[in-house]
Amino acid sequence: MESTISLKVNKGKGKGSKGASSSDDKSKFDVVKEWTNWSLKKAKVVTHYGFIPLVIFVGMNSDPKPHLFQLLSPV
């Protein structure tokens, strides 16, 4: 049994490196897109769980110092 190897040939106009460049650009774009989505998801979680502790921390360090109940009450 003979094994054959098939290679794809770029039949488009222009230089062959142009096709490789566009695929590299697409893969770079995909990597940037994945990193952006990942970082935005992490930022959303940090904001979600960190907002209330941040408000309490800033409120406790303000002058005059309020009680914890006053910080947590909506009024």
UniProtKB/Swiss-Prot annotation:
Tell me where in or outside the cell this protein is found.
Mitochondrion outer membrane
Instruction: Give membrane topology per the record.
Output: Single-pass membrane protein
Q: What ranges are annotated Cytoplasmic (topological domains)?
A: 1-46
Q: What is its main location?
A: mitochondrion
Topological domains annotated Mitochondrial intermembrane? 65-75
Q: Which InterPro entries match?
A: Tom7
**Which GO BP terms sit in this record?**
protein import into mitochondrial matrix
TM annotation in the entry: 47-64
- What are the record keywords, sorted? Acetylation, Membrane, Mitochondrion, Mitochondrion outer membrane, Protein transport, Transmembrane, Transmembrane helix, Transport
User: Taxonomically, which superkingdom?
Assistant: Eukaryota
Its tissue distribution reads: Expressed in roots, flowers, young cotyledons and leaves.
- What is the purpose of this protein? Seems to act as a modulator of the dynamics of the mitochondrial protein transport machinery. Seems to promote the dissociation of subunits of the outer membrane translocase.
Subunit (UniProt): Forms part of the preprotein translocase complex of the outer mitochondrial membrane (TOM complex) which consists of at least 6 different proteins (TOM5, TOM6, TOM7, TOM20, TOM22/TOM9 and TOM40).
| PANTHER family assigned to the protein according to its UniProt record, in alphabetical order | MITOCHONDRIAL IMPORT RECEPTOR SUBUNIT TOM7
Homology family: Belongs to the Tom7 family.
Specify the protein name. Mitochondrial import receptor subunit TOM7-1
Q: Which species?
A: Arabidopsis thaliana (Mouse-ear cress)
Question: What is the name of the gene encoding this protein?
Answer: TOM7-1
